[in-house]
Amino acid sequence: MIVLCGAKNRDIEGIKITVLDVGQGDGIVLSGKGKNYLIDGGSSDVKQAGAQRIEPYLLSEGIGCLDYVFVTHGDEDHISGIRELLEGQKLGVRIDTLVLPPEEYHDEKLADLARIAVENGTRVVSVKTGANIYGRGERQTEKNDSKEVMRLRCIGPLTDIPQGLTKPKAGNEASLVLEFSYGNFDMLFTGDVEGAGEELLVKSDVLRKYEILKCAHHGSKNSGTAAFLEKTDPRAAIISAGIDNRYGHPHEETLNRLKKRKVKTYNTQTDGAVTIKSDGIQISIESFLLSK
């Protein structure tokens, strides 16, 4: 099966990012400049998150094809819905390319997902740290002075480890970390990165300041350290977690670290899906539900 994606979704002025409410998991849709992306898609407490949460949203937005689906790591709460989309794309939303972390960080779950993708006509690639993906028709170069350029850049996991730092293990620590920019707007997507993986990002100086942070690992205690927040200095943060989840996410310590820095925090538990829109200058953030 050959997948050809076109800009058939509803016309978007600028970019639109929606952190879907998939319960205890992640599912993020990014649209703009003629392209549609999905960053992770799964849940550990919502059955058929792909068919019941992700695909209905995509279709409601007029998105019949995803140019890229990024998988930060192989945990079920990040890939269960993607598996459903891959297996059902002959009649549903099509996926052009599945993007995985660097090969040295692959595990059995990622290998199995890649196999399913190939069997269903989806191209599979492993992204390298430093790689850039641009909007449709934009120059595929690092030097691009247009303020309206949309770029998604892979900044982690690092494969060249500086001396004295620990290489992250496959899984959460080696999550794909993506930096998105459009004009003066930028956002950081962190998967479940924590521990050695997060420390490596901080100490290797690949991080910078971002308007919005997608909090790692559903707001767990061991992610989003004070040092990490000092580097990224977000104005707003978004946490994706399930109601009454057995892990206690988001952790009180993480919320306190964000509060201490006066970061406006959104949580899908109470806010439902969270949508960010930007024309490259102004930013709006809307939640599906009203927080209590």
Residue ranges, per PLM feature:
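Non-globular, low-confidence helical/coil segments that flank catalytic cores
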Residues: 1-292
